[in-house]
A protein has these predicted regions:
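Extreme N-terminal starter segment of soluble prokaryotic enzymes
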Residues: 3-10
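Short loop/turn motifs at secondary-structure junctions
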Residues: 7, 36-37, 143, 164-166
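Short polar catalytic/cofactor-binding loops
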Residues: 12-17
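Short, solvent-exposed loop/turn segments at secondary-structure boundaries
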Residues: 19-23, 124-125
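Cys-nucleophile CN-hydrolase/nitrilase-fold catalytic domain and related Cys-dependent amidase chemistry
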Residues: 20, 28-106
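Short, acidic/polar
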Residues: 22-31, 154-161
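Active-site catalytic loop in hydrolytic enzyme cores
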Residues: 92-165
Length: 166
């Protein structure tokens, strides 16, 4: 049951293409500017690398596992600032690459979902594998869909999932 509004902050950072260190530094530097009453901070798609497609091995070099440095940092920041953080990163499962959404809660709970509708005009489908699950997170009484960018154009299935999340 929803008991209060959810205060959401968007983080429209300048993305340095393929430059994880600069993108992570920007996030760390600007975190103190986020309003302290924020409940959820939403980062851009592939916030740590920029939207990268093209050569699969080049993309793989930028990828991480769910237990990599990027997610470890997001967990640390969510705990430190007391709000959930959502976004996406390039995930490597040891074989396939995914544009993977994350939702990290201040208590360390984590949820991951892979982008389902890959953007063929940017050749995303040639590099990344498609996700299959439609996931929603229950956070502070709200059902929040785990979708990435182009997935938003296909909301029917997302709406069904949100309505059925308890």
């Amino acid at each position: 049951m929803i008991t209060k509004p959810l205060k959401v902050a968007l983080f429209p950072q300048e993305i340095f293409w393929k430059d994880k260190a600069s993108n992570i530094d920007t996030l760390i530097r600007l975190m103190p500017t986020i309003h302290p009453e924020t409940d959820l901070l939403i980062l851009p798609e592939m916030f740590s690398t920029g939207f990268v497609t093209g050569d699969k091995e080049e993309v793989r070099a930028l990828a991480e596992r769910n237990t990599g440095k990027t997610i470890d940092l997001i967990k640390e920041l969510a705990s430190q600032y007391g709000f959930a953080i959502a976004g996406s990163f390039i995930a490597d499962t040891g074989g396939s690459l995914y544009n993977r959404a994350f939702f990290i809660e201040p208590n360390g709970d984590e949820t991951f979902a892979d982008k389902k509708h890959l953007f063929t005009m940017a050749k995303e489908d040639r590099v990344f594998s498609r996700g299959h699950d439609r996931l929603a997170v229950r956070y502070r009484g709200w059902n929040i869909a785990m979708i990435v960018c182009y997935d938003i154009r296909f909301l029917y299935g997302v709406a069904i999932k949100i309505m059925n999340t308890t």
